[in-house]
């Protein structure tokens, strides 16, 4: 199985797999059962911003999700990613719909990682920034139902021609270049990721959510990982 570290923007509470009984932000370490969660006042039809950061000195993974003009939601978890992830990883965004549905639209996405070693050269940095997405992106690996549209947006899950969301869809987008996330001689390994998103739903209960994730470089969508498993995990263990 893939090794996954993720921050989930979970719009549908699946209490049978340990979700709280409300939409939430969660930090997932190798399991869909979140290590830490915070209640999320999800606003359908409004553009939101998610910011995820990690610092290996503090060994803390944090996420802040906000909408313009309203209070933000923060969640954090103390974890040493050196002990969880392989040295080289890929970063991505994943989303699913199930019986209930929503659009999982990404408007922009940026990422910066820095690996500071004792040597002078700081060659192990990576930065990318998408303010819009091209029709045939060379620098993204699209998996499942993920596509880019004519408006320059990334649609992680299926939408019909009129833009309405489809159920039972799973899609992921990964940056093509692997990231050197840690090294034994590194003094500090850190990263920051930011994405803006738009979730719209005709349903009273939108589902299932958008996730920022880090995984082994050869990661693929696990069989049966749709819906509540967020396109990341083969089971709910």
Curated annotation (Swiss-Prot):
Further remark: Binds one manganese (or another transition metal) ion and one calcium ion. The metal ions are essential for the saccharide-binding and cell-agglutinating activities. Is being tested as a molluscicide with potential application in controlling schistosomiasis. The causative agent of schistosomiasis depends on freshwater snails of the genus Biomphalaria as hosts during its larval stages.
Pfam families in the cross-refs: Lectin_legB
Primary location recorded for the protein, binned into one broad class: other
Binding, a carbohydrate: 12, 99-100, 228
Organism: Dioclea virgata
Domain of life: Eukaryota
Cellular component GO terms held in the UniProt record: aleurone grain; vacuole
PTM comment: The beta and gamma chains are produced by partial proteolytic processing of the lectin alpha chain by an asparaginyl endopeptidase. Mixture of 60% alpha lectin and 40% of its beta and gamma proteolytic fragments.
Entry keyword set: Calcium, Lectin, Manganese, Mannose-binding, Metal-binding, Toxin, Vacuole
PANTHER family from the UniProt entry: CONCANAVALIN A-LIKE LECTIN FAMILY PROTEIN (PTHR32401), LEGUME LECTIN DOMAIN-CONTAINING PROTEIN (PTHR32401:SF47)
Subunit structure as annotated in this protein's UniProt entry: Equilibrium between homodimer and homotetramer. Oligomerization is pH-dependent with homotetramers forming at pH 6.5 and above.
Name of the protein this chain belongs to: Lectin alpha chain
């Amino acid at each position: 199985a893939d090794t996954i570290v993720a921050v989930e923007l979970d719009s549908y509470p699946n209490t049978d797999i340990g979700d709280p009984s409300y939409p939430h932000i969660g930090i997932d370490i190798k399991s869909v059962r979140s290590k830490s969660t915070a209640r999320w006042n999800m606003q359908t039809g409004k553009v939101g911003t998610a910011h995820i950061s990690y610092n290996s000195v503090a060994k803390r993974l944090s996420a802040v999700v906000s909408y313009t003009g309203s209070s933000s939601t923060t969640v954090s978890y103390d974890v040493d990613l050196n002990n969880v992830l392989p040295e080289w990883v890929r970063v991505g965004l994943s989303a699913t719909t199930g019986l209930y549905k929503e659009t999982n639209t990404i408007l922009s996405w940026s990422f910066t990682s820095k690996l500071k070693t004792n040597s002078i050269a700081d060659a192990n940095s990576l930065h990318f920034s998408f303010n819009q997405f091209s029709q045939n992106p060379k620098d993204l690996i699209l998996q499942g139902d993920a596509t880019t549209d004519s408006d320059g947006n990334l649609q992680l899950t299926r939408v019909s021609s009129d833009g309405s969301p489809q159920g039972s869809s799973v899609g992921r987008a990964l940056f093509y270049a692997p990231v050197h996330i840690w090294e034994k001689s590194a003094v500090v390994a850190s990263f920051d990721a930011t994405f803006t998103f738009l979730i719209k739903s005709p349903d009273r209960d939108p589902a299932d959510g958008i996730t920022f994730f880090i995984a082994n470089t050869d990661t693929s969508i696990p069989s049966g990982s749709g819906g509540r498993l967020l396109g990341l995990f083969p089971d709910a263990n």
